[in-house]
């Protein structure tokens, strides 16, 4: 599946952020929880047959593969399959892991075709 350039840029920015955040840390691994939004019975936004849950799962798996190349980072996934996980459980996964960073990936959709860009909450 081909992704717009902004998805690729987002992955690069997140990778750089995590790389810089781990620089100079103690010997403890930096724990990142990757959360692919929606899943299972919750498709998220849709356009034709394309569902948000599928796109964000692909993005999270690609990002995780990149992050796992850094031996100082432990990657924890809230889901690796198309399953529904309650929001509270997603938070529990991060809290139990004592994660340093929680990244929840979504692809918002609007009917207004002039709307463009991304949003990030830290």
Language-model features: where?
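Short linear recognition/processing motifs and adjacent strand/loop elements at protein termini
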Residues: 2, 23-26
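Catalytic-core regions of hydrolytic enzymes
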Residues: 25-122
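Bacterial N-terminal signal peptides that target proteins for export
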Residues: 2-11
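Short intrinsically disordered, low-complexity coil segments enriched in acidic
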Residues: 10, 14-15, 59
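Hydrophobic h-region of N-terminal signal peptides that target proteins for export
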Residues: 15-24
């Amino acid at each position: 599946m081909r992704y717009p350039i902004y998805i690729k840029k987002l992955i690069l920015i997140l990778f750089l952020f995590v790389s810089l955040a781990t620089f100079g840390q103690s010997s403890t691994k930096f724990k990142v929880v990757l959360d692919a939004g929606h899943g299972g019975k919750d498709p998220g936004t849709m356009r034709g047959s394309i569902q948000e849950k599928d796109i964000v799962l692909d993005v999270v798996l690609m990002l995780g593969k990149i992050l796992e190349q850094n031996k100082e980072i432990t990657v924890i996934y809230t889901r690796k399959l198309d399953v529904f996980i309650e929001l509270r459980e997603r938070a529990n996964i991060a809290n139990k892991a004592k994660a340093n960073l929680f990244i929840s990936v979504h692809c918002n959709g609007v009917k207004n075709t002039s709307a463009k860009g991304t949003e990030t909450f830290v």
